[in-house]
Amino acid sequence: MALNKSTLEAHLEDLITDYYDLQFPSAFKLNEPPSPLEALRMISKSHPTVIRGYSPLREGVSREWRVPATYIELHGNGTEVAIAVTDDGLADSVRTLGSGETTFVKPLEERMSMTTFLSKLTANGGEALYLQSQDGNIYRSQPGMRGEPELASFQQVVERDVAWMRDAMGSTAVAVNLWIGNSRSTTSFHHDPYENVYHVLSGVKRFTLLSPVEGLCLEQHFQPPSTLVRGVDGELQPERDPEPAHPVPWVQSLVPPREVRPIIVELEEGDTLYLPADWWHKVEQEEGSGGLAVAVNYWYTSELRPERYALLRFAQRVARSAGREGVLDPDAGMDDDSGDIDDVMFSDGSVTSDDEWDPSEWGR
């Protein structure tokens, strides 16, 4: 006998209840960096973990990370960097236009010297600026990314890898990024397909975290993409991307659904967060005493576990059948020529997130 939508919805509610029966309600905490074996166990548990006592800086490096002068000294005044510019601090988000239509809006990208950027940032007025290039701007190992990373000058002070994470994963970080902003910049809910090690150098970062299971409660829809441009009056406004422009799946709401129990993590200077792959997160920040909120993060490829992959797709199909239109259809696009999981499977049967996603498209 076919199940009606109300029965399927009840099963989904039971799924969340069963999850909460066993899921720890807050982030795990480690008072010192894990060994590679402990890190492997941490990854296997796939639960956010706050780590204290770790530093991504090279041994013997001593800098005052709260002040702009440090970044100008390391990068040089003349070399320009790519800066995301918005009017509301939401670099990647869904907006409702005057016509009532919604669109996924990317920031205007402007190039400016590190000195100009930091001067405008610490003035804390006008438009919101964020250094968030996220394509491995310090280090990168992603095939197809050409040229030297934009912030390669920071390699003299930032380690190439998190040693215990590298040894646990058996691979080097696919991307290492520097993020510089202030309290005006925030993110909407999104998830990244990479194991993430995130360290705060200056200020405070506040993460609102939802597990992949809780992600079934989010309203995610495909949106036509737009990019902020300057109008004739100099004001920023979204402009639709030229064709062919592929719709972007994104969550519009900045507030967690009522039925979920988000984990809130507040990272202070010197704290590190291990954020498992595919956990949804919204990030807010506060600048430190020098007017800056700064972090370094490492993305590691995540092995796709067959049972988790299959069960999550099954849950998505159930959610769609129950009428949850905000859950993406896992079977959409399966008839095109983009290939399937067999196309990215290694000879040992393993599949990693590195085979399916480009880090430059994630994590803003």
Protein language model features and the residues they cover:
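N-terminal accessory scaffold of Fe(II)-dependent oxygenases
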Residues: A2-T272, W279-R364
